[in-house]
Amino acid sequence: MHFRAITRIVGLLVILFSGTMIIPGLVALIYRDGAGRAFTQTFFVALAIGSMLWWPNRKEKGELKSREGFLIVVLFWTVLGSVGALPFIFSESPNLTITDAFFESFSGLTTTGATTLVGLDSLPHAILFYRQMLQWFGGMGIIVLAVAILPILGVGGMQLYRAEMPGPLKDNKMRPRIAETAKTLWLIYVLLTVACALALWFAGMDAFDAIGHSFATIAIGGFSTHDASIGYFDSPTINTIIAIFLLISGCNYGLHFSLLSGRSLKVYWRDPEFRMFIGVQFTLVVICTLVLWFHNVYSSALMTINQAFFQVVSMATTAGFTTDSIARWPLFLPVLLLCSAFIGGCAGSTGGGLKVIRILLLFKQGNRELKRLVHPNAVYSIKLGNRALPERILEAVWGFFSAYALVFIVSMLAIIATGVDDFSAFASVVATLNNLGPGLGVVADNFTSMNPVAKWILIANMLFGRLEVFTLLVLFTPTFWRE
Protein backbone atom coordinates (compact mmCIF):
# COMPACT_ATOMS: atom_id res chain seq x y z
CA MET A 1 0.00 0.00 0.00
CA HIS A 2 1.57 3.30 -1.12
CA PHE A 3 0.47 5.44 1.83
CA ARG A 4 2.67 8.39 0.90
CA ALA A 5 1.32 8.53 -2.66
CA ILE A 6 -2.22 8.38 -1.24
CA THR A 7 -1.42 11.16 1.27
CA ARG A 8 -0.10 13.32 -1.59
CA ILE A 9 -3.36 12.94 -3.54
CA VAL A 10 -5.54 13.61 -0.46
CA GLY A 11 -3.42 16.68 0.42
CA LEU A 12 -3.88 18.01 -3.11
CA LEU A 13 -7.66 17.49 -2.88
CA VAL A 14 -7.82 19.43 0.40
CA ILE A 15 -5.77 22.29 -1.11
CA LEU A 16 -8.17 22.43 -4.08
CA PHE A 17 -11.15 22.29 -1.72
CA SER A 18 -9.77 25.20 0.33
CA GLY A 19 -9.94 27.32 -2.84
CA THR A 20 -13.71 26.78 -3.08
CA MET A 21 -14.12 28.75 0.20
CA ILE A 22 -13.40 31.94 -1.76
CA ILE A 23 -16.80 31.70 -3.54
CA PRO A 24 -19.09 31.80 -0.43
CA GLY A 25 -16.64 34.38 0.97
CA LEU A 26 -17.44 36.62 -2.02
CA VAL A 27 -21.18 35.99 -1.50
CA ALA A 28 -20.74 37.20 2.11
CA LEU A 29 -19.09 40.38 0.77
CA ILE A 30 -21.86 41.01 -1.78
CA TYR A 31 -24.68 40.57 0.77
CA ARG A 32 -22.67 41.98 3.73
CA ASP A 33 -24.15 39.25 5.94
CA GLY A 34 -21.19 38.92 8.31
CA ALA A 35 -20.54 35.24 7.49
CA GLY A 36 -17.29 35.89 5.61
CA ARG A 37 -14.99 35.28 8.58
CA ALA A 38 -15.99 31.57 8.86
CA PHE A 39 -14.95 30.99 5.23
CA THR A 40 -11.69 32.95 5.59
CA GLN A 41 -10.77 30.84 8.65
CA THR A 42 -11.70 27.62 6.83
CA PHE A 43 -9.65 28.66 3.79
CA PHE A 44 -6.46 29.05 5.85
CA VAL A 45 -7.04 25.95 8.03
CA ALA A 46 -7.81 23.74 4.98
CA LEU A 47 -4.85 25.17 3.05
CA ALA A 48 -2.55 24.42 6.02
CA ILE A 49 -3.88 20.85 6.42
CA GLY A 50 -3.64 20.18 2.68
CA SER A 51 -0.11 21.60 2.46
CA MET A 52 1.07 19.51 5.44
CA LEU A 53 -0.23 16.38 3.72
CA TRP A 54 1.02 17.26 0.23
CA TRP A 55 4.41 18.99 0.68
CA PRO A 56 6.40 16.13 2.34
CA ASN A 57 5.01 13.62 -0.20
CA ARG A 58 4.94 15.79 -3.33
CA LYS A 59 7.47 13.58 -5.19
CA GLU A 60 5.71 10.30 -4.38
CA LYS A 61 4.03 9.12 -7.57
CA GLY A 62 4.31 5.34 -7.25
CA GLU A 63 2.16 2.74 -8.94
CA LEU A 64 -1.45 2.86 -7.78
CA LYS A 65 -3.32 -0.44 -7.74
CA SER A 66 -7.07 -0.82 -7.26
CA ARG A 67 -6.55 -1.22 -3.48
CA GLU A 68 -5.13 2.29 -3.26
CA GLY A 69 -8.04 3.42 -5.46
CA PHE A 70 -10.56 2.23 -2.86
CA LEU A 71 -8.75 4.06 -0.07
CA ILE A 72 -8.46 7.30 -2.09
CA VAL A 73 -12.18 7.25 -2.94
CA VAL A 74 -13.20 6.71 0.71
CA LEU A 75 -10.72 9.34 1.95
CA PHE A 76 -12.00 11.81 -0.68
CA TRP A 77 -15.46 11.76 0.89
CA THR A 78 -14.46 11.43 4.57
CA VAL A 79 -11.68 14.05 4.54
CA LEU A 80 -13.58 16.61 2.43
CA GLY A 81 -16.75 15.98 4.46
CA SER A 82 -14.78 16.70 7.64
CA VAL A 83 -13.09 19.83 6.24
CA GLY A 84 -16.46 20.92 4.84
CA ALA A 85 -17.87 21.00 8.39
CA LEU A 86 -15.45 23.79 9.41
CA PRO A 87 -17.52 26.78 8.10
CA PHE A 88 -20.52 25.50 10.11
CA ILE A 89 -18.31 25.15 13.22
CA PHE A 90 -16.69 28.60 12.82
CA SER A 91 -19.94 30.36 11.92
CA GLU A 92 -21.92 32.28 14.56
CA SER A 93 -25.17 31.92 12.60
CA PRO A 94 -26.19 29.09 12.50
CA ASN A 95 -24.73 28.09 15.86
CA LEU A 96 -24.32 24.33 15.30
CA THR A 97 -22.85 21.62 17.52
CA ILE A 98 -19.86 19.71 16.08
CA THR A 99 -22.13 16.71 15.38
CA ASP A 100 -24.67 18.87 13.52
CA ALA A 101 -21.88 20.61 11.55
CA PHE A 102 -20.53 17.24 10.38
CA PHE A 103 -24.05 16.00 9.62
CA GLU A 104 -24.79 19.06 7.48
CA SER A 105 -21.46 18.84 5.63
CA PHE A 106 -21.66 15.10 4.86
CA SER A 107 -25.33 15.46 3.90
CA GLY A 108 -24.34 18.17 1.40
CA LEU A 109 -21.29 16.46 -0.05
CA THR A 110 -23.00 13.07 -0.45
CA THR A 111 -26.02 14.92 -1.97
CA THR A 112 -28.33 13.40 0.66
CA GLY A 113 -30.09 16.66 1.51
CA ALA A 114 -31.05 15.75 5.08
CA THR A 115 -30.67 18.80 7.33
CA THR A 116 -30.44 19.73 11.01
CA LEU A 117 -31.04 23.43 10.27
CA VAL A 118 -34.29 25.28 10.92
CA GLY A 119 -34.96 28.94 10.12
CA LEU A 120 -33.18 28.85 6.74
CA ASP A 121 -34.92 32.04 5.62
CA SER A 122 -33.12 34.06 8.30
CA LEU A 123 -29.63 32.56 7.78
CA PRO A 124 -26.77 34.51 6.10
CA HIS A 125 -26.77 34.22 2.29
CA ALA A 126 -23.17 32.95 2.33
CA ILE A 127 -24.07 29.94 4.52
CA LEU A 128 -27.11 29.14 2.35
CA PHE A 129 -24.99 29.39 -0.81
CA TYR A 130 -22.27 27.20 0.74
CA ARG A 131 -24.78 24.39 1.48
CA GLN A 132 -25.96 24.43 -2.14
CA MET A 133 -22.36 24.58 -3.41
CA LEU A 134 -21.38 21.56 -1.28
CA GLN A 135 -24.07 19.51 -3.02
CA TRP A 136 -22.98 20.70 -6.44
CA PHE A 137 -19.33 19.74 -5.86
CA GLY A 138 -20.49 16.46 -4.33
CA GLY A 139 -22.53 15.72 -7.45
CA MET A 140 -19.54 16.55 -9.62
CA GLY A 141 -17.42 14.05 -7.69
CA ILE A 142 -20.14 11.40 -7.87
CA ILE A 143 -20.40 11.61 -11.67
CA VAL A 144 -16.67 11.00 -12.10
CA LEU A 145 -16.70 8.37 -9.35
CA ALA A 146 -19.63 6.48 -10.90
CA VAL A 147 -18.66 6.67 -14.57
CA ALA A 148 -14.87 6.84 -14.57
CA ILE A 149 -13.40 5.46 -11.32
CA LEU A 150 -15.63 2.78 -9.71
CA PRO A 151 -15.89 0.68 -12.91
CA ILE A 152 -12.07 0.49 -12.97
CA LEU A 153 -12.16 -0.73 -9.35
CA GLY A 154 -14.84 -3.25 -10.31
CA VAL A 155 -17.59 -1.72 -8.14
CA GLY A 156 -20.78 0.23 -8.80
CA GLY A 157 -23.72 0.07 -11.17
CA MET A 158 -21.72 1.12 -14.23
CA GLN A 159 -19.60 -2.02 -13.76
CA LEU A 160 -22.64 -3.90 -15.08
CA TYR A 161 -22.03 -2.23 -18.45
CA ARG A 162 -18.35 -3.24 -18.49
CA ALA A 163 -17.61 -6.83 -17.58
CA GLU A 164 -13.84 -6.48 -18.12
CA MET A 165 -11.83 -5.14 -15.22
CA PRO A 166 -8.22 -4.05 -15.81
CA GLY A 167 -5.37 -5.38 -13.66
CA PRO A 168 -2.94 -3.18 -11.68
CA LEU A 169 -3.42 0.44 -12.62
CA LYS A 170 -0.34 2.54 -13.12
CA ASP A 171 -0.84 6.12 -12.03
CA ASN A 172 0.21 7.50 -15.42
CA LYS A 173 -2.00 5.09 -17.41
CA MET A 174 -5.01 5.72 -15.24
CA ARG A 175 -4.80 9.49 -15.30
CA PRO A 176 -5.42 10.37 -18.98
CA ARG A 177 -8.47 8.09 -19.23
CA ILE A 178 -10.09 9.39 -16.08
CA ALA A 179 -9.08 13.00 -16.77
CA GLU A 180 -10.43 12.87 -20.33
CA THR A 181 -13.76 11.33 -19.32
CA ALA A 182 -14.02 13.63 -16.29
CA LYS A 183 -13.60 16.76 -18.43
CA THR A 184 -16.44 15.80 -20.76
CA LEU A 185 -18.71 14.73 -17.89
CA TRP A 186 -18.07 17.96 -16.03
CA LEU A 187 -18.81 19.95 -19.18
CA ILE A 188 -22.21 18.21 -19.42
CA TYR A 189 -22.76 18.79 -15.69
CA VAL A 190 -21.93 22.52 -15.93
CA LEU A 191 -24.08 23.00 -19.07
CA LEU A 192 -27.07 21.34 -17.37
CA THR A 193 -26.56 23.54 -14.28
CA VAL A 194 -26.47 26.74 -16.37
CA ALA A 195 -29.57 25.67 -18.35
CA CYS A 196 -31.44 24.84 -15.12
CA ALA A 197 -30.45 28.15 -13.45
CA LEU A 198 -31.59 30.18 -16.47
CA ALA A 199 -34.90 28.29 -16.69
CA LEU A 200 -35.60 28.87 -12.97
CA TRP A 201 -34.65 32.54 -13.28
CA PHE A 202 -37.01 33.03 -16.23
CA ALA A 203 -39.73 31.22 -14.24
CA GLY A 204 -39.58 33.87 -11.51
CA MET A 205 -36.84 32.94 -9.02
CA ASP A 206 -34.30 35.64 -8.14
CA ALA A 207 -30.70 35.02 -9.29
CA PHE A 208 -29.52 33.77 -5.86
CA ASP A 209 -32.31 31.19 -5.52
CA ALA A 210 -32.07 30.15 -9.18
CA ILE A 211 -28.34 29.42 -8.92
CA GLY A 212 -28.71 27.72 -5.52
CA HIS A 213 -31.57 25.49 -6.60
CA SER A 214 -29.93 24.62 -9.94
CA PHE A 215 -26.90 23.38 -7.92
CA ALA A 216 -29.12 21.15 -5.76
CA THR A 217 -31.26 19.98 -8.71
CA ILE A 218 -28.48 18.83 -11.02
CA ALA A 219 -26.68 17.20 -8.08
CA ILE A 220 -30.02 15.56 -7.07
CA GLY A 221 -29.28 16.92 -3.61
CA GLY A 222 -32.45 18.45 -2.25
CA PHE A 223 -31.09 21.30 -0.11
CA SER A 224 -33.10 24.50 -0.43
CA THR A 225 -32.52 28.10 0.63
CA HIS A 226 -35.98 28.17 2.28
CA ASP A 227 -37.62 26.16 5.07
CA ALA A 228 -40.65 25.52 2.83
CA SER A 229 -38.30 24.09 0.14
CA ILE A 230 -39.80 24.48 -3.37
CA GLY A 231 -43.22 25.12 -1.79
CA TYR A 232 -41.92 28.61 -0.92
CA PHE A 233 -42.25 29.66 -4.58
CA ASP A 234 -45.78 28.27 -4.99
CA SER A 235 -45.27 27.97 -8.76
CA PRO A 236 -46.37 25.00 -10.92
CA THR A 237 -43.90 26.20 -13.61
CA ILE A 238 -40.94 26.02 -11.20
CA ASN A 239 -42.12 22.58 -10.00
CA THR A 240 -42.19 21.32 -13.60
CA ILE A 241 -38.76 22.76 -14.51
CA ILE A 242 -37.12 21.17 -11.45
CA ALA A 243 -38.83 17.80 -12.09
CA ILE A 244 -37.64 17.77 -15.74
CA PHE A 245 -34.04 18.55 -14.78
CA LEU A 246 -34.18 15.92 -12.02
CA LEU A 247 -35.21 13.34 -14.63
CA ILE A 248 -32.31 14.41 -16.88
CA SER A 249 -29.86 14.15 -13.96
CA GLY A 250 -31.34 10.82 -12.88
CA CYS A 251 -30.29 9.31 -16.23
CA ASN A 252 -26.95 7.62 -16.82
CA TYR A 253 -24.48 10.40 -17.71
CA GLY A 254 -22.92 7.91 -20.13
CA LEU A 255 -26.02 8.42 -22.31
CA HIS A 256 -25.60 12.23 -22.22
CA PHE A 257 -21.95 11.59 -23.11
CA SER A 258 -23.05 9.54 -26.16
CA LEU A 259 -25.43 12.30 -27.27
CA LEU A 260 -22.64 14.88 -27.00
CA SER A 261 -20.41 12.57 -29.08
CA GLY A 262 -22.84 12.89 -31.98
CA ARG A 263 -25.15 9.92 -31.40
CA SER A 264 -28.90 10.35 -31.95
CA LEU A 265 -31.57 10.68 -29.24
CA LYS A 266 -32.45 7.03 -29.89
CA VAL A 267 -29.47 6.12 -27.70
CA TYR A 268 -31.70 6.79 -24.67
CA TRP A 269 -34.62 4.62 -25.70
CA ARG A 270 -32.34 1.76 -26.73
CA ASP A 271 -31.03 1.61 -23.16
CA PRO A 272 -33.09 -0.90 -21.09
CA GLU A 273 -32.22 0.89 -17.83
CA PHE A 274 -33.51 4.24 -19.15
CA ARG A 275 -36.76 2.62 -20.33
CA MET A 276 -37.34 1.08 -16.90
CA PHE A 277 -36.40 4.36 -15.15
CA ILE A 278 -39.02 6.32 -17.15
CA GLY A 279 -41.54 3.48 -16.75
CA VAL A 280 -41.20 3.51 -12.95
CA GLN A 281 -41.59 7.31 -12.78
CA PHE A 282 -44.65 7.25 -15.07
CA THR A 283 -46.35 4.44 -13.09
CA LEU A 284 -45.77 6.23 -9.78
CA VAL A 285 -47.12 9.53 -11.16
CA VAL A 286 -50.30 7.79 -12.35
CA ILE A 287 -50.81 6.04 -8.97
CA CYS A 288 -50.22 9.26 -6.99
CA THR A 289 -52.48 11.34 -9.23
CA LEU A 290 -55.36 8.85 -8.91
CA VAL A 291 -55.05 8.53 -5.11
CA LEU A 292 -54.80 12.32 -4.60
CA TRP A 293 -57.76 12.90 -6.92
CA PHE A 294 -59.83 10.21 -5.19
CA HIS A 295 -59.14 11.81 -1.77
CA ASN A 296 -59.78 15.39 -3.04
CA VAL A 297 -56.45 16.63 -1.66
CA TYR A 298 -56.19 19.45 -4.24
CA SER A 299 -58.89 21.64 -5.72
CA SER A 300 -58.17 21.10 -9.44
CA ALA A 301 -57.04 18.27 -11.72
CA LEU A 302 -54.07 20.29 -13.04
CA MET A 303 -52.86 21.05 -9.52
CA THR A 304 -53.16 17.36 -8.60
CA ILE A 305 -51.12 16.25 -11.65
CA ASN A 306 -48.47 18.94 -11.06
CA GLN A 307 -48.02 18.06 -7.38
CA ALA A 308 -47.98 14.31 -8.10
CA PHE A 309 -45.45 14.71 -10.94
CA PHE A 310 -43.12 16.92 -8.90
CA GLN A 311 -43.26 14.92 -5.68
CA VAL A 312 -42.86 11.53 -7.38
CA VAL A 313 -39.83 12.63 -9.41
CA SER A 314 -38.31 14.40 -6.40
CA MET A 315 -38.59 11.34 -4.13
CA ALA A 316 -38.00 8.60 -6.71
CA THR A 317 -34.80 10.22 -8.03
CA THR A 318 -33.72 10.72 -4.36
CA ALA A 319 -33.63 14.54 -4.52
CA GLY A 320 -36.05 15.03 -1.64
CA PHE A 321 -37.37 18.50 -2.53
CA THR A 322 -40.90 19.12 -1.27
CA THR A 323 -43.67 21.51 -2.36
CA ASP A 324 -46.18 20.52 0.25
CA SER A 325 -45.94 18.51 3.45
CA ILE A 326 -46.55 15.05 1.99
CA ALA A 327 -47.31 13.97 5.55
CA ARG A 328 -50.84 15.36 4.92
CA TRP A 329 -51.26 13.06 1.91
CA PRO A 330 -53.02 9.70 2.46
CA LEU A 331 -50.41 7.57 4.35
CA PHE A 332 -50.12 5.07 1.48
CA LEU A 333 -48.46 7.70 -0.76
CA PRO A 334 -45.64 8.95 1.52
CA VAL A 335 -44.70 5.33 2.30
CA LEU A 336 -44.86 4.40 -1.42
CA LEU A 337 -42.63 7.36 -2.34
CA LEU A 338 -40.19 6.57 0.47
CA CYS A 339 -39.96 3.00 -0.86
CA SER A 340 -39.48 4.29 -4.43
CA ALA A 341 -36.19 5.82 -3.23
CA PHE A 342 -34.86 2.24 -2.88
CA ILE A 343 -34.83 2.06 -6.69
CA GLY A 344 -33.32 5.54 -7.09
CA GLY A 345 -31.65 6.84 -10.24
CA CYS A 346 -29.77 5.12 -13.04
CA ALA A 347 -26.20 3.88 -12.68
CA GLY A 348 -23.79 6.69 -13.55
CA SER A 349 -26.18 9.42 -12.37
CA THR A 350 -26.16 11.73 -9.35
CA GLY A 351 -29.16 9.84 -7.92
CA GLY A 352 -28.97 7.51 -4.91
CA GLY A 353 -30.73 4.23 -4.13
CA LEU A 354 -29.97 0.70 -5.30
CA LYS A 355 -29.96 1.95 -8.95
CA VAL A 356 -32.46 0.99 -11.64
CA ILE A 357 -30.06 -1.38 -13.44
CA ARG A 358 -29.69 -3.60 -10.35
CA ILE A 359 -33.46 -3.76 -9.79
CA LEU A 360 -33.89 -4.63 -13.49
CA LEU A 361 -31.37 -7.48 -13.20
CA LEU A 362 -32.97 -8.76 -9.98
CA PHE A 363 -36.32 -8.91 -11.84
CA LYS A 364 -34.70 -10.72 -14.77
CA GLN A 365 -33.11 -13.23 -12.39
CA GLY A 366 -36.42 -13.81 -10.62
CA ASN A 367 -38.06 -14.41 -14.00
CA ARG A 368 -35.30 -16.86 -14.96
CA GLU A 369 -35.80 -18.86 -11.73
CA LEU A 370 -39.54 -19.14 -12.45
CA LYS A 371 -38.77 -20.47 -15.96
CA ARG A 372 -36.29 -22.97 -14.48
CA LEU A 373 -38.98 -24.33 -12.16
CA VAL A 374 -41.08 -25.16 -15.23
CA HIS A 375 -38.14 -26.35 -17.42
CA PRO A 376 -35.39 -27.55 -15.03
CA ASN A 377 -33.04 -28.70 -17.82
CA ALA A 378 -33.29 -25.62 -20.03
CA VAL A 379 -30.40 -23.13 -20.17
CA TYR A 380 -31.47 -19.50 -19.83
CA SER A 381 -29.09 -16.57 -20.11
CA ILE A 382 -29.88 -13.07 -18.85
CA LYS A 383 -29.48 -10.35 -21.46
CA LEU A 384 -29.03 -6.62 -21.16
CA GLY A 385 -30.04 -5.24 -24.53
CA ASN A 386 -28.61 -7.82 -26.95
CA ARG A 387 -25.71 -8.88 -24.74
CA ALA A 388 -25.76 -11.93 -22.48
CA LEU A 389 -24.36 -11.10 -19.06
CA PRO A 390 -21.73 -13.30 -17.41
CA GLU A 391 -22.73 -15.03 -14.15
CA ARG A 392 -20.05 -13.04 -12.31
CA ILE A 393 -21.99 -9.82 -12.91
CA LEU A 394 -25.21 -11.38 -11.61
CA GLU A 395 -23.41 -12.69 -8.53
CA ALA A 396 -22.11 -9.14 -7.92
CA VAL A 397 -25.70 -7.81 -8.01
CA TRP A 398 -26.81 -10.36 -5.40
CA GLY A 399 -23.69 -9.63 -3.35
CA PHE A 400 -24.46 -5.91 -3.42
CA PHE A 401 -28.09 -6.52 -2.50
CA SER A 402 -27.07 -8.70 0.49
CA ALA A 403 -24.49 -6.16 1.72
CA TYR A 404 -27.02 -3.34 1.32
CA ALA A 405 -29.68 -5.27 3.29
CA LEU A 406 -27.15 -6.06 6.04
CA VAL A 407 -26.09 -2.39 6.40
CA PHE A 408 -29.76 -1.35 6.38
CA ILE A 409 -30.85 -3.76 9.13
CA VAL A 410 -27.80 -3.16 11.37
CA SER A 411 -28.20 0.64 11.03
CA MET A 412 -31.91 0.52 11.81
CA LEU A 413 -31.41 -1.65 14.91
CA ALA A 414 -28.54 0.60 16.08
CA ILE A 415 -30.74 3.71 15.76
CA ILE A 416 -33.64 2.04 17.60
CA ALA A 417 -31.11 1.16 20.35
CA THR A 418 -30.39 4.90 20.80
CA GLY A 419 -34.04 5.48 21.74
CA VAL A 420 -35.61 6.51 18.41
CA ASP A 421 -39.05 5.03 17.61
CA ASP A 422 -39.04 2.19 15.08
CA PHE A 423 -40.94 4.01 12.29
CA SER A 424 -38.66 7.07 12.44
CA ALA A 425 -35.60 4.79 12.59
CA PHE A 426 -36.77 2.99 9.43
CA ALA A 427 -37.54 6.28 7.65
CA SER A 428 -34.22 7.89 8.64
CA VAL A 429 -32.20 4.91 7.36
CA VAL A 430 -34.16 4.88 4.08
CA ALA A 431 -33.57 8.64 3.76
CA THR A 432 -29.79 8.49 4.40
CA LEU A 433 -28.73 5.13 2.92
CA ASN A 434 -30.54 6.02 -0.33
CA ASN A 435 -29.22 9.63 -0.18
CA LEU A 436 -32.82 10.84 -0.27
CA GLY A 437 -32.95 13.49 2.49
CA PRO A 438 -36.34 13.88 4.17
CA GLY A 439 -38.00 10.87 5.78
CA LEU A 440 -41.24 10.36 7.70
CA GLY A 441 -42.12 10.48 11.40
CA VAL A 442 -39.82 12.75 13.44
CA VAL A 443 -37.52 13.18 10.40
CA ALA A 444 -40.26 14.28 7.98
CA ASP A 445 -38.89 17.85 7.75
CA ASN A 446 -35.47 17.80 9.44
CA PHE A 447 -33.19 15.70 11.63
CA THR A 448 -32.84 18.25 14.46
CA SER A 449 -34.58 16.07 17.05
CA MET A 450 -32.37 12.99 16.43
CA ASN A 451 -29.87 12.26 19.22
CA PRO A 452 -26.10 12.73 18.50
CA VAL A 453 -25.30 8.97 18.38
CA ALA A 454 -28.10 8.37 15.84
CA LYS A 455 -26.78 11.28 13.75
CA TRP A 456 -23.30 9.71 13.53
CA ILE A 457 -24.85 6.38 12.46
CA LEU A 458 -26.77 8.28 9.76
CA ILE A 459 -23.57 10.04 8.60
CA ALA A 460 -22.02 6.58 8.11
CA ASN A 461 -25.18 5.58 6.20
CA MET A 462 -24.80 8.55 3.84
CA LEU A 463 -21.27 7.38 3.05
CA PHE A 464 -22.35 3.75 2.57
CA GLY A 465 -25.09 4.89 0.18
CA ARG A 466 -22.88 7.25 -1.77
CA LEU A 467 -19.94 4.84 -2.09
CA GLU A 468 -22.14 1.95 -3.25
CA VAL A 469 -21.67 0.00 0.04
CA PHE A 470 -18.81 -2.25 -1.13
CA THR A 471 -16.29 0.57 -1.59
CA LEU A 472 -16.55 1.38 2.12
CA LEU A 473 -17.18 -2.18 3.34
CA VAL A 474 -14.02 -3.55 1.68
CA LEU A 475 -11.90 -1.37 4.02
CA PHE A 476 -13.18 -3.38 7.00
CA THR A 477 -11.90 -6.71 5.65
CA PRO A 478 -8.50 -8.02 6.90
CA THR A 479 -7.65 -9.14 3.33
CA PHE A 480 -7.64 -5.52 2.16
CA TRP A 481 -4.81 -4.55 4.54
CA ARG A 482 -2.68 -7.67 3.96
CA GLU A 483 0.35 -7.09 1.78
UniProtKB/Swiss-Prot annotation:
In the record, what terms sit under GO molecular function? potassium channel activity; potassium ion binding; potassium ion transmembrane transporter activity; potassium:chloride symporter activity
Transmembrane region positions?
3-29, 36-57, 66-90, 125-150, 178-202, 274-294, 390-417
* Record topological domains on the Periplasmic side: 30-35, 116-124, 203-205, 225-234, 323-330, 418-419, 440-451
Region (Selectivity filter part 1), start-end ranges: 110-115
Q: Name one GO cellular component term.
A: plasma membrane
Region annotation (Selectivity filter part 2) maps to 219-224
| InterPro entries given in the database record | Cat_transpt (IPR003445), TrkH (IPR004772)
User: What's in the keyword line of the UniProt record?
Assistant: Cell inner membrane, Cell membrane, Ion channel, Ion transport, Membrane, Metal-binding, Potassium, Potassium transport, Transmembrane, Transmembrane helix, Transport
The residues the record assigns to binding K(+) are: 111-112, 220-221, 318-319, 435-436
| Residue intervals on the Cytoplasmic side | 1-2, 58-65, 151-177
For this chain, the family text in UniProt reads: Belongs to the TrkH potassium transport family.
Protein's name according to its UniProt entry: Trk system potassium uptake protein TrkH
Q: Which gene encodes it?
A: trkH
